[in-house]
Amino acid sequence: MEFSVKSGSPEKQRSACIVVGVYEPRRLSGIAEQLDKISEGYISNLLRRGDLEGKPGQMLLLHHVPNVLSERVLLVGCGKERELDERQYKQIITKTINTLNETGSMEAVCFLTELHVKGRDTYWKVREAVESTQNSLYSFDALKTRKGETRRPLRKLVFNVPTRRELTVGERAIEHGMAVSAGMHLCRDVANMPPNICNPAYLASQARQIAENTENLTVTTVGEEQMEKLGMNSYLAVGRGSDNESVMTIMEYKGAVDNTQKPIVLIGKGLTFDSGGISLKPGEGMDEMKYDMGGAAGVIGAMKALCDMQLPINVIGVLAGCENMPSSNAYRPGDILTTMSGQTVEVLNTDAEGRLVLCDVLTYVERFDPELVVDTATLTGACVIALGKHASGLFSGHNPLAHELLNAGEQSGDRAWRMPLWDEYQEHLESPFADMTNLGGRPAGSITAACFLSRFAKKYNWAHLDVAGTAWNSGANKGSTGRPVPLLTQFLINRAGVDQGE
């Protein structure tokens, strides 16, 4: 898909289709009024006849509108003018793209980016239009022998901005939107891959592919032999039951002009399949445990977006690849593990494995002397119960970092909700035999999991994102969502100090 931005009047556009908005009840947007004027009331007459009410998502395709150079005009219902918010705007863009494809338009000039969206500027509207367009066109059929015959002729989309001085902002928005979309696309592709293909080594191979096309990205891996020398016994224990070797992939991006700038570290839980181990999960829905590497998929997607934008910061992405399987060699409930930090953990349940992998990675990244560390993981079902599918759980003892991430989530529409990390919850992890247990019981499960991780993140500013509810969808629309790529990428854009708006 080719995107561009321009500033012009609708009557001068020579395109396959012009897209303009209509408000409820039957009220023309400013651009639609211009078209109505040059067409001598053609559009307003249709509305008076009741052809379109203007309700959100309603579509009316017009052919050969009088005095309009473009072959078609697509009227898009936008709801009530004062109520148009970001959620409705995204839905309208998605419906518009689907309609353009279904009706055979190869190119279009879209004036929806001129609509007033509460609290949003031109940069946001153009970037969100790009991201919504790309997401609506995504499909995963790489492993199907019979590909779907979806009609997708749309090849070029031009977004109109109100003034010429906003062209630079619009171009930047397209650049950023394309990068975020590419990151989400990669995240979804990797996460949707079946576990017989996507194993820890596969994660490493995907990282190397990005490095092949990015001069300032280097990729190294840490295998089981090296982990053993490092004392990463907790990480190793989780993968012990699998024939697939555990692999930790390090993606080091150097974009800062100042070589001494401390790196931001992003850690992704990469359980490419989680059977639960000896504490075996129920069979129903176990196929979705291929998505237990959603955190790593999010990190590799964010790193892809970062490389495409070439942001002037230093970032290290760590993919904690592992597979949790039952076997005679698997770790057991009752085992006591000595972590890389030296702290000991009593295993109460082998299905609380993500934290056992992440705790050693949190210790490992101390060597990078990081500016800050954000780990992202499909860590707990308890977070799904607490927040559902709309918000990721955010945990941090560092208020400025927490606020940065929450703000990035609001900016990108990939929202998070801050959860408590109070000392009282630490008591749930007490063990009579070790420094702590790996399970705090049913109450406050997502919080006690974060409390566990916090014990290994004392030497830097740290935040934890639990994306168990947001990384993938179940049911008829089963598949990766591409989250938290938008949140992580927006956080990096903000950190880089890149100009984003007016």
Swiss-Prot record:
Q: What biological-process terms (Gene Ontology) are attached? A: proteolysis
Cofactor: how and how many bound: Binds 2 manganese ions per subunit.
Q: Which InterPro entries match?
A: Leucine_aapep/pepB (IPR011356), Macro_dom-like (IPR043472), Peptidase_M17_C (IPR000819), Peptidase_M17_leu_NH2_pept (IPR023042), Peptidase_M17_N (IPR008283)
Q: Where in the cell is it found?
A: Cytoplasm
Task: Write out the residues that bind Mn(2+) 1.
Answer: D274, D351, E353
Q: Indicate the residues that form the catalytic site.
A: K281, R355
Q: What is its main location?
A: cytoplasm
On the tree of life, the source organism's domain of life is Bacteria
The UniProt keyword set, sorted, is: Aminopeptidase, Cytoplasm, Hydrolase, Manganese, Metal-binding, Protease
Catalysed reactions listed for this entry: Release of an N-terminal amino acid, Xaa-|-Yaa-, in which Xaa is preferably Leu, but may be other amino acids including Pro although not Arg or Lys, and Yaa may be Pro. Amino acid amides and methyl esters are also readily hydrolyzed, but rates on arylamides are exceedingly low; Release of an N-terminal amino acid, preferentially leucine, but not glutamic or aspartic acids
Q: Which NCBIfam families match?
A: PRK00913.1-1, PRK00913.1-4
- Could you say which protein family the record assigns here? Belongs to the peptidase M17 family.
For this entry, the protein name equals Probable cytosol aminopeptidase
